[in-house]
Swiss-Prot record:
Keywords: Chromatin regulator, Dioxygenase, Iron, Metal-binding, Nucleus, Oxidoreductase, Zinc, Zinc-finger
UniProt name for this protein: Histone demethylase JHD2
Required cofactor names: Fe(2+)
Reaction equations catalysed: N(6),N(6),N(6)-trimethyl-L-lysyl(4)-[histone H3] + 3 2-oxoglutarate + 3 O2 = L-lysyl(4)-[histone H3] + 3 formaldehyde + 3 succinate + 3 CO2
PROSITE patterns: JMJC (PS51184), JMJN (PS51183), ZF_PHD_1 (PS01359), ZF_PHD_2 (PS50016)
GO cellular component term, pick one: nucleus
Residues at which Fe cation binds: 427, 430, 517
MF-aspect GO terms: histone H3K4 demethylase activity; histone H3K4me/H3K4me2/H3K4me3 demethylase activity; zinc ion binding
Chief place of localization: nucleus
Protein family per UniProt: Belongs to the JARID1 histone demethylase family.
Organism: Saccharomyces cerevisiae (strain ATCC 204508 / S288c) (Baker's yeast)
Zn finger residue spans: PHD-type: 235-285
């Protein structure tokens, strides 16, 4: 596999990282490969500056086999089949222990030779359903609906069965036998739900994975002290109505242990049934998977000792090359032996808040006691260096300082402490920003990158491999829990470009916008990472808004706010930015603003009540929220939103004057914890109105309220003033 280019900036170039990375030649390399390696000039080697006495962290526990996309889908499907059989009280008691069956058949070329082959139930199911996906929107890259054909049509589709038979190299008759014996009754159940499959899943703030119990069954060794992959709710509230009343008419799912009122179910039950009862979420499957968190707080020396034991447990006595470690890692990930899960620990996304625990780079807030004299002078130089990751997001020509606040994980570095084969799964950076990852010490980290040119093909490949999973978890690739080997033959077959990097101590990896990346650690190492922006990132930032709406992924900052801040700064001092960049911001803002304004005018013709919110925020409060999110698509409501009443009989219990004094956090909590109201962005509100008008039972929307988060008058004024200055 081709490696990404390594760059060797001069000392002067290294002191101006934004300008250096904006160089057209560097940009072309970044766009082509997705990321580049930056090796600092000789003499740059900042000491690891961590408060060893007080720095602790809780690592994630990773089960490598369950991170593989195909493995996980196969196990999910087996669980779903078993839950279905339990729910219908199948007299056959055919509870599956493995996600496959072994078939025997004669070789077509050598009749005397008997072939044995594993056929995975999910593989058959996914081939049968993948051609039935329908687009809910022509702009969507992820398909959001799945329509199940009538089973008689499915059984009679000879062309489909021939295609599957050819793909698996298994006779059609055997495949049909597998379908009828293991899958058909479950398929009929899903067909009965048809396009409402997604509505059968119960929204749950703390979902449980179907694989949780399996993972809990494995002994993780003497170093294990695992927590849960989801937070426990503080009460026994019904998953549907969120109320804790009527315990005698509350039933627990025998798969996930979640409580439900029997009258909140669809259809409702008259009484609590005897025997096993399984909720629809556990039968259909929610596709959720999360890491288990270790409850033990590790110090750095303690984790290093764990890493030594891990190396002894997993590695031979001789030293392995990077290529051998790489082959071993992907072998562990892609194997499917449920009796021997390989578990590793990864100190990921560590964001402590005290001096000496936030970053491994030198800072003025934490100076080790043993540093003095000339060492102190050098130490302070590193404190102020632009490639100190505490400074990079705020470096000259970066845009993130315009927010005038810290964004955890983006403008404040997060620490990553690896152990052998701990992994970071395929993902892009938030809002397609650039990122810088620096290794302070330890064993190499292996990276893989898929540049922007391969993103669509990569998305299509994953959707093809798991057609139902991306419907249940549309933001799956933002969850950092999914791997597929870049050496999988499907990568080459799909024409997906993929590159590799081996990062060693005192080296930076820079990821460019819209680059998928993943990788693993070859042993103990200490890294940290932060995000930053460059002028050419701007269109990617706007593109992320559209893409995130489709996958219901929340943005971490408001692009409209960023553009407003750029124009406001330029309006006060035209020398702060070059005119070409400001014109780009100006045109992007005009397009966004005019589109939003048209929607607002349509809503004002329907919704008579409008209010301008006056919300005060504290930039020094790290838990402060700055943006109001749409309940439906999770986009930021940059200019306006509608408070939609879902329960008209009780809505008047809400006092209008009280809502005017809610904080942004309270607004967001209102829409997530109270089923009576929703916060809708202007686009989703107009869609909901259209659906009401097209339905037979039209409901009134006279009580809905339009709220402005910004003054249209102020925005108009700023646009006019900047327009005049740009035209000079």
């Amino acid at each position: 596999m081709e490696e990404i280019p390594a760059l060797y900036p001069t000392e002067q170039e290294f002191k101006n990282p934004i300008d250096y990375l904006s160089n057209p030649h560097i940009k072309r390399l970044g766009v082509r490969y997705g990321m580049v390696k930056v090796v600092p000039p000789n003499g740059f080697c900042p000491p690891l500056s961590i408060d060893m006495e007080n720095f602790t962290f809780q690592p994630r526990i990773q089960n490598l086999e369950n991170l593989d996309l195909k493995n996980r889908c196969r196990l999910f499907f087996m669980k779903q089949l078993n839950n279905f059989k339990r729910s219908v009280k199948d007299p056959s008691k055919l509870i599956l222990r493995e996600p496959y069956t072994i078939v025997e058949y004669s070789d077509s070329t050598h009749a005397s030779e008997i072939l044995k082959k594993k056929v995975y139930f999910y593989d058959v199911f996914s081939e049968l359903i993948k051609d039935n996906r329908t687009l809910t929107d022509t702009t969507q890259s992820f398909r959001r609906k799945l329509k199940f054909r009538d089973i008689s049509q499915l059984r009679g589709d000879i062309s489909l069965w021939r295609t599957i038979s050819k793909k698996f190299n298994v006779p059609i008759g055997l495949l049909k036998e597998i379908f009828e014996k293991y899958i058909a009754s479950y398929y009929i159940f899903l067909h009965s739900l048809n396009e409402n499959v997604h509505t059968a899943l119960h929204a749950d703030q703390y979902p449980k994975s179907l694989l949780s119990d399996d993972e809990d069954d494995f002994d993780l060794g003497p170093d294990s002290n695992s927590g849960s992959d989801f937070e426990e709710d503080d009460d026994d509230a019904c998953i549907v109505c969120r109320k804790t009343n009527d315990p005698k008419r509350t039933i627990l799912c025998d798969s996930c242990d979640k409580p439900f009122h029997i009258y909140c179910l669809s259809p409702p039950l008259e009484r609590v049934p005897s025997g096993d009862w399984i909720c629809n979420t556990c039968i259909v499957g929610n596709g959720y998977y999360g890491f288990t968190q270790d409850t033990h707080d590790y110090s750095l020396p303690e984790f290093q000792e764990y890493c030594k034991r891990q190396n002894s447990r997993l590695l031979p006595a001789r030293k392995l090359s990077i290529d051998e470690l790489e082959e071993m890692f992907w072998s562990l990930v892609t194997k499917n032996r449920r009796s021997s899960l390989t578990t590793v620990k990864y100190g990921a996304d560590i964001h402590n808040e005290l001096p000496g625990q936030i970053t491994g780079f030198p800072t003025r807030e934490f100076i080790p006691k043993n540093i003095n004299g000339d060492e102190l002078i050098d130490y302070l130089k590193y404190c102020d260096h632009p490639m100190n990751l505490t400074n990079l997001p705020m470096a000259h020509n970066s845009l993130l300082p315009l927010f005038k606040r810290n964004i955890s994980g983006m403008t404040i570095p997060w620490i990553y402490i690896g152990s052998l084969f701990s992994t970071f799964c395929w993902h892009m950076e938030d809002q397609y920003t650039l990122s810088a990852n620096y290794q302070h010490e330890g064993d190499p980290k292996v990276w893989y990158s898929i540049p922007e040119s391969g993103c669509t093909k990569f998305n299509d490949l994953l959707n093809d491999m798991s057609p139902d999973l991306f419907i249940k978890q549309p933001d799956l690739l933002h969850q950092l829990v999914t791997l597929i080997s870049p050496y999988d033959p499907n990568f080459k077959k799909s024409g997906i470009p993929v590159y590799k990097a081996v990062q060693k101590p005192n080296e930076y990896i820079i990821t460019f916008p819209k680059c998928y990346h993943a990788g693993f650690n070859t042993g103990y190492n200490f890294n940290e990472a932060v995000n930053f922006t460059i002028d050419f990132w701007l269109p990617y930032g706007f593109g992320a808004i559209t893409d995130y709406k489709l996958t219901q992924k929340a943005c971490v900052f408001d692009m409209f706010d960023l553009m407003i801040n750029v124009l406001d700064k330029y309006n006060k001092d035209t020398l702060l930015f070059n005119d070409a960049f400001v014109r780009q911001c100006y045109s992007s803002l005009i397009v966004f603003y005019n589109t939003e304004l048209k929607r607002i005018r349509k809503i004002q013709a329907i919704v008579p009540r409008t209010t301008l919110l006056e919300v005060h925020t504290d930039p020094n409060d790290e838990d402060e929220e700055y943006d109001i999110f749409c309940s439906q698509c999770k986009t930021i409501c940059s200019i306006a939103f509608v408070l939609r009443k879902n329960n008209y009989d009780s809505i008047r219990t809400y006092k209008r004057h009280k809502k005017n004094h809610l904080s942004i956090r309270q607004w967001n909590e209102l829409s997530t914890t109270d089923s009576k109201v929703s916060i809708l962005c202007t686009q989703d509100y107009l869609k909901s109105i259209q659906n009401l008008n097209n339905s037979d039972g039209e409901e009134p929307y006279i009580d809905d309220e339009l709220y402005f988060t910004k003054s249209l008058k102020d925005i108009d004024s700023l646009i006019k003033q900047v327009g005049v200055k740009l035209d000079r």
